């Protein structure tokens, strides 16, 4: 039976608090302070156990400051006081623009920031009750971890049926939607009475310009008390004086835009999370979901991939809508913000290390690295996609060999910034002239990510120097003959098919692509995905067939390299460990690869 008296349009009715009670007179209730302390210890332990590095644990604690019980409520009460009228004059002006109400005076202060995660749940009707209960536990855990969740319920089939004008009254569909809102709210309440949820209808109104917040306090009040707002996708139309169903994606877009206008020291939207029965964005290559999507670089390619016909059209449209909605929302947020798309079953996983939502809050990374080669058996298939607005990526490639000075003069790269990136990453000074003498004219590829946050320089190295030189001489003669024929008006033959297929280019029998420099700014190392973006560009786009590299045996990054390599070999009598990966690696040349890795002289000198 629908409990319509609990919530009405334009109001937010508080729901009863659950209190701890004992089942028998012989047992004693756990004191709130002790319970809060135990929860805090458990949370800190989960952070330290789940974060892969000390840096990730430190970043999480500094950002989210996990608090429980009374501590959590006090912190968020202070934050909402700032939201409703505290702080600098400029802050007050921006808050007034957001809420439509002037602040009412200095009520308190807090040094923290409200860290918001907007969660959209689609097709709730298809989700089993036990999964909804477990999802409620995940949402409650997010709150205890210092995140402030806002749940947006998708109207789904109810909205589609209403738009088809099947003659049923609006109230019929309103009830169906509110049933979904209550179902999610009850799951959160059951999971954690201390956190609790607040179902909200009447938060939005709309006119010809779009959505607006009709009563901002309905959202801010539960947030201030550590409660989880669960929003119905309903809005009052100021033009027609009717309440209407709205798209959940439009609600996510609007909320993100408006909350992004709040000063960052008061409120920050950190995560956009879509829980969808179809899961993450599907990948042809992975036979599962894309692990990570750098939207600035990959959006158009992935949209085109979804039209390849490997999934039914109805599913394709849902994935495209999710991709578009994520892109629109993340554009309003800082680069550190991220989006997640996963299934209800995965969102319900209780394990911290396996639940991608919880894991991403703790580490700011996907459960597995996106740069793990797809063809390796140790790379699992996932149903979750992590998305960021991301960073632009510059890629240069040449079969004959690039020259760093020439590319700098052309404006394709900034060599000074590239030097700085390499030295900052390695903590050593680079002998520039020595390096240029070695690599110029033999650079196979250059990848630069973001604002020179990460880069890779790949060179062509001779497997058999004599035969390699013969090949280069033959290529020069062929080029000269082709130029002479063209000048004489003789038509040139069509290029071989492999030249049109890109990654199907056969391996040069006398050369190998060698990762000479792989650098990431120290401030971008760890969870920013820069290393993954660069490495993925090398092994999945530029050089998918074969890539060779070396690393000092004591390099702490070697574990990361081991996970991404097809094989490795510690070279006896040297300080080097050799790695190789790719679809068509030539293990028969390993002895010659060892020669390459041992004969290259380092260009990095003394420590900075």
UniProtKB/Swiss-Prot annotation:
It catalyses: L-glutamate + acetyl-CoA = N-acetyl-L-glutamate + CoA + H(+). Its EC number is 2.3.1.1. Gene3D superfamilies: 3.40.630.30, Acetylglutamate kinase-like. GO terms for biological process: L-arginine biosynthetic process; ornithine biosynthetic process. The keyword Acyltransferase applies. Pathway: Amino-acid biosynthesis; L-arginine biosynthesis; N(2)-acetyl-L-ornithine from L-glutamate: step 1/4. Residues 402-604 form the N-acetyltransferase domain. Keywords: Acyltransferase, Amino-acid biosynthesis, Mitochondrion, Transferase, Transit peptide. It comes from the Eukaryota. One of its GO terms (cellular component) is mitochondrial matrix. It is an enzyme of class 2 (transferase). InterPro entries: AceGlu_kinase-like_sf, GlcNAc_Synth_fun, Vertebrate-like_GNAT_dom. It holds the Pfam family NAT. Belongs to the acetyltransferase family. N-acetylglutamate synthase involved in arginine biosynthesis. This is Amino-acid acetyltransferase, mitochondrial. It comes from Yarrowia lipolytica (strain CLIB 122 / E 150) (Yeast). The lineage of its organism: Eukaryota, Fungi, Dikarya, Ascomycota, Saccharomycotina. The gene is ARG2.
